[in-house]
Amino acid sequence: MPWNSEHTNWFFKIETNLKSKDGKEVCLLEYNYDLNDKTVLSKWAKHFRNHYCFDSEIDFLRNGTGLSRKDFLVQLKFPTEARGFGSGIRSGDFSEILVADYLEYILGYWVPRTRYGNKTIRDESTKGTDLIGFKLYDENKTTKDVLKMFEVKAQYSGNKAKPRLQDAIDDSIKDDLRKAESLNAIKQRLFDKGKTEEALKVARFQNQVDMPYTSEFGVAALYSNDIYDEDVIINCDTSAHPYNSALFLIVIKGDDMMKLVHKLFEIAADES
């Protein structure tokens, strides 16, 4: 399998009493990546690339285009680096995948990777809930099983921090309404890839009335350190969220994050 988790070792939890305006605790993480660690970056780039196009499928998909693997990815699959909305889509995709990795490899959820490979327009974001993670305890389909819906927002440029955590909270309010469509999309993409067993895991969560489980919600904001502002975080308010008691708040920050975003896309293409 192409997946790898070594880059999640660069997460460091900052001990803090950070809370929202209404008293919800905020988990604060520093992402201390190392651009000199070529081994980890290479494994991460492969992991990242396979969200857009599996290495096992790229030669078939590029057949007829006259493009090399690198050019196929750069010209047809990856969001553009500078044109139009491309840079913003790059940062958004990167941030969602990084939070998915934290959710899966640090917090222990299963997060299907189906969101980016079937884009029709590469410089557009995929509709629906940003991330869905699952915990299944056994085959008995107990109420302990967990479905966690996550919204992710990022800001890696600008002179002033925007309320990205509040934006994620506001978007998360709609997640329960989008759940059925998002689950169906994940299940269908898994089935289309021949991953029937994984598709059936998703099916377990499609009828909460007859097969109850625990619903959780999460929101994440990611910033570059040069614009991160704690005051913006503590002014966010979750009180309007209908599932406030089941809401997890996380902020991830790191140095020059947009540089990292572009570097990862570059390595992913170069090493394809």
Give short role names for the model-derived ranges.
Residues 1-70, 77, 265-272:
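Nuclease-adjacent, charged terminal/linker segments that flank catalytic cores
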Residues 137-145:
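Short, solvent-exposed loop/turn segments that connect beta-strands within catalytic domains
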Residues 201-272:
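Charged, structured surface patches that assemble and position nucleic-acid processing machinery
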